[in-house]
Amino acid sequence: MKKICFVTRHAIVNYGSFLQTYATQKLFEDYGYNAEVLDYVREDEEYHNVTELLLKKSKKWNRNIFTRLIYRIVQWPDHYICGRAFEKERAKYLNLSERITNPVVDANKIPTADIYCTGSDQVWGEIAQDDVDPMYFLSFAPHDAKKIAFSASFGKENYPKERIDKFRELLSGYNYITVREDSAVNIVNKAGYEAIQILDPTMIFGGDRWRKQLLPIHEKGYVLLYQLNANREMDEYAKQFANKAGLKLLRVSVEAHNCMRVGKFKLCLSPFKFLSYIANAEYMITDSFHGTAFAIMFNRQFVEVLPKEKITRNLSVLKQFGLEDRI
């Protein structure tokens, strides 16, 4: 059996990140490959480091000992408790390689494979310090290895010429490129290469298969709010929508401080329990790409509230299914 090793942003405490990684692994197995996830976890994405690293960058919270204490009290449950919970889910469901945190120091841990692949999600966008990470462009793979991209994303649609020039260099070793958004096709074309647009892996995997992963829940008659970006107008809209529909409002999140916002709070559900809440909702209100994707797959009524930034992927999936009226 041939082996494929793929890299994606699987280690973020985020439902979409986990579920698209799981779907990619399963799809490659369907295609007859032994699929392995490169367990590349950047230092700034390790759950036990995130709180302190973000605090160092925050002018608002890094002012004095008291503001730093408040920040740690509020953020630590999100990053540590939910981080550990997601790590257990990854260990249970994903075929992970040895952990790699430094591509130079850990070079001997790079798996041998027949094909190396950049997976889905926002792998080709600016990740830290407003720059891209070469690891997600397969910089770790042998020079003569076969390299592909599977539903990759840049996260946004416009980049300056200097960044396009950098993409031209980073994409030069790929044998085949598929991307998630129509705007990503344009970026790859500007860099001088061909790309084909395909669906996100979660959608290729399909609603029927996801339904087999659902877990029992007891909640009924609710509007589900899945919100990634702070937006008071969205909070108020969700509250009024649920009241008008005569339904209770449930909020799912991996951020404990969201317990102070509208809706009955569900903290850090397992990924498949999260899907169960979407599948059983009367309505869903979301600003999340993957929230939208699963609402479509489970044939749920939903309202899309576009985030202020990085709206390309949300718009793209709505356009693909002719659902722009859900905005």
Regions found by a protein language model. Give the residues of each.
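Donor nucleotide-activated moiety binding/catalytic core segment of transferases
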Residues: 195-203, 207, 254-287, 292
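Leloir-type glycosyltransferase catalytic cores
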Residues: 320-327
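Aromatic- and Gly/Pro-rich donor/ligand-binding loops
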Residues: 6-15, 19-169
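A short beta-strand/loop micro-motif in the catalytic core of glycosyltransferases
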Residues: 174-181, 285
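Nucleotide-sugar donor-binding and catalytic loop/hinge architecture
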Residues: 2, 112, 141-144, 210-222
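Catalytic donor nucleotide-activated moiety binding site of glycosyltransferases and closely related
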Residues: 146-156, 184-188, 227-228, 233-270
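A donor-sugar binding/catalytic signature common to diverse glycosyltransferases
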Residues: 277-317
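Acidic anion/phosphate-binding donor-loop and adjacent secondary structure
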Residues: 157-162, 203-216
